[in-house]
């Protein structure tokens, strides 16, 4: 069995080399980030840096650009390293769907997902978040007080719910200290935000 494995490794030299490069690449990034910890960088207490980087690298191996070419071939190694470091310094994990890698013009970028944004917000005192859609025919009212948006009311009739008649959306964030924050976007703003994301048509 041992001989068979050795022969198999010898004939499959390229995949084996990829594994070695993978491990040394991740080890190098891990050491760089651990070195930065001496100068103030910190990670969440439940964050396993090497596991997150290895999981991200495995995800990158399966990720393709819009031309269906593997990202590890079409993107520069510097941009791949930077995207991995960006993910790690945010304390996020692609395996937990907290972000994803995208290729733009030969450059790999890490982009936070909705779950990544929620994870970061919770670290900074967010207790909960509630989101609602505003449809044509809804009665929605808010005011601004000391620079903060305050929700007054949102009355919605079941018959107003129609995906072709969405006027906007809002989110109410409840903080650990009991304060609330309101964010409101009209449909034009939402589409503009979508247009900056990967895969929007």
Predicted feature locations:
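Structured, charged N-terminal subsegments at the starts of enzyme catalytic cores
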Residues: 5-6, 10-16, 20
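Binding-interface segments
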Residues: 17, 21-201
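Short, Lys/Arg-enriched N-terminal segments with co-localized hydrophobic residues
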Residues: 1-2
């Amino acid at each position: 069995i041992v001989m068979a494995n050795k022969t198999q490794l010898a004939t499959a030299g390229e995949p084996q080399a990829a594994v070695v490069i993978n491990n040394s690449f991740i080890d190098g990034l891990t050491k760089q980030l651990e070195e930065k910890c001496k100068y103030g960088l910190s990670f969440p207490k439940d964050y396993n840096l090497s596991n997150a980087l290895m999981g991200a690298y495995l995800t990158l191996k399966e990720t393709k650009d819009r031309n269906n070419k593997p990202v590890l071939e079409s993107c520069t190694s510097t941009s791949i390293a930077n995207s991995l470091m960006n993910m790690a310094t945010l304390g996020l994990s692609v395996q937990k769907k907290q972000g994803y890698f995208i290729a733009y013009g030969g450059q790999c970028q890490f982009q936070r997902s909705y779950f990544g944004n929620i994870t970061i917000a919770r670290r900074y005192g967010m207790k909960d978040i509630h989101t609602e859609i505003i449809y044509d025919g809804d009665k929605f009212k808010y005011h601004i007080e000391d620079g903060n948006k305050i929700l007054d009311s949102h009355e919605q009739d079941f018959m107003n719910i129609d995906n072709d008649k969405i006027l906007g959306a809002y989110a109410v964030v409840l903080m650990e200290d009991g304060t609330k924050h309101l964010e409101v976007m009209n449909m034009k703003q939402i589409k503009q935000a979508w247009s900056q994301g990967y895969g929007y048509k």
